[in-house]
Every structure is written in structure tokens, then in C-alpha cells.
Amino acid sequence: MNILHNFVVFEGIDGTGTSTQLRALERHFQARKDMVFTQEPTGGEIGTLIRDVLQKRVIMSSKALGLLFAADRHEHLEGAGGINDCLAEGKIVLCDRYVFSSLVYQGMAVSGSFAYELNKEFPLPEVVFYFDAPIEVCVERITARGLQTELYEYTSFQEKARKGYETIFRKCRHLYPAMKVIEIDAREEIEVVHERILHHLREYRRLK
């Protein structure tokens, strides 16, 4: 499996703070021109359609949504100015969510084999920060943002997703030792988590 040097990914269930921490790093490194901060779904046309589906403005099947995620990821990697171009220029790319989210969520919505077949050819990042926190902590944070779904159903769904992430990263540690998986205790305060991530980035990338 191909490993992309200088490609760093943040993963975790909703409410663990991946987006919050990516924005904090973007502010911290705003003066640097050799760092790129991005996310999936992207802000492109395919990514925008995905967001419309996730927000129930557009209705489609789970399989169709999985295909859209794969198409968005392919364009994110291979498109002009995408991840591969940035890495080729010697930049460090940090991304909020990547292939692991699809393996978890499309694996739950359709099947693990479907998600794997769609995503097996994508290269892996050099480093993954896996944000983990108890479900009740995540639900409390999501509720504070205005949760618009039935609480029990949402909690059950996220419990399954958390187990899915744990299974995937346990397998990754065994199958792909060249990809570093760093588990982050996302229960801690935002500033504490931010400093932990900075420590690891400095350790691996010698960042200032």
C-alpha cells in the first residue's frame, strides 16, 4: 500500500473535535506557505453535493453516496492543485477526514466489502491522528451545537461508528506499520489537545 509522505489525516466520530483542531492548527501556522489545510467532503462540486445529501436537501441511496465520496476523494487527490500536487511541491497536507471515514460510515450504511472495494486503491497518509472520546462526551458537544435528530438513535449510531474506527485502526497498525496511528484523548480541553498535536507534529515533521 502506497504511503504519502507529509500527508496527515484527522479522524474520529462526530463531536471529537477534528474540525476544531484543524482550524486551530491553521491559525497557528498561518504564516507558513508550505502547509495546506483541507477536508473531506471537499468544497468542490462533488463535495457540495455530498453535503446536500448529508443535510437531507438531496435524497439518494447509500450506495450512490458512497460512490460520490470516492469520486470526491479521487478529485481531491488527483485534481489540479489537489493533495498530490501539493505534496509534489514539498508541502505538508493536513486533512480533516479521509478514507477511514468512508470505511466506517459507508461500511455501516451498506457493507464493509462495498466500502473496501471503493477505497482500496487510495494511498494512505503518513500519519493519522485518531480522536477518541466516550459517546456521552461527543453527544453532549453535538447537542450543544443543536442536534437535530432523535438522541437514542444518534447515540447508538455513533457507538457503532466508534467501534468501527477502533477495529479499522487496530487492523491498520498490524497491516500497515509504516502508517503512524496516534490516538488522541479528545475528552481533554481544546487547548490541551492542540498542544498534544503540536508536540507530535514537531516530533515527526520538526515543525516550529
Curated annotation (Swiss-Prot):
GO terms for molecular function: ATP binding; dTMP kinase activity. Pfam families: Thymidylate_kin. The keyword Nucleotide-binding applies. It catalyses: dTMP + ATP = dTDP + ADP. Keywords: ATP-binding, Kinase, Nucleotide biosynthesis, Nucleotide-binding, Transferase. Belongs to the thymidylate kinase family. One of its GO terms (cellular component) is cytoplasm. InterPro entries: P-loop_NTPase, Thymidylate_kin-like_dom, Thymidylate_kin_CS, Thymidylate_kinase. It comes from the Bacteria. SUPFAM superfamilies: P-loop containing nucleoside triphosphate hydrolases. PANTHER family: THYMIDYLATE KINASE, UMP-CMP KINASE 2, MITOCHONDRIAL. It comes from Treponema pallidum (strain Nichols). It is an enzyme of class 2 (transferase). Residues 12-19 are annotated as: Defective ATP-binding. This is Putative thymidylate kinase. The keyword Transferase applies. GO terms for biological process: dTDP biosynthetic process; dTTP biosynthetic process; dUDP biosynthetic process. Its EC number is 2.7.4.9.
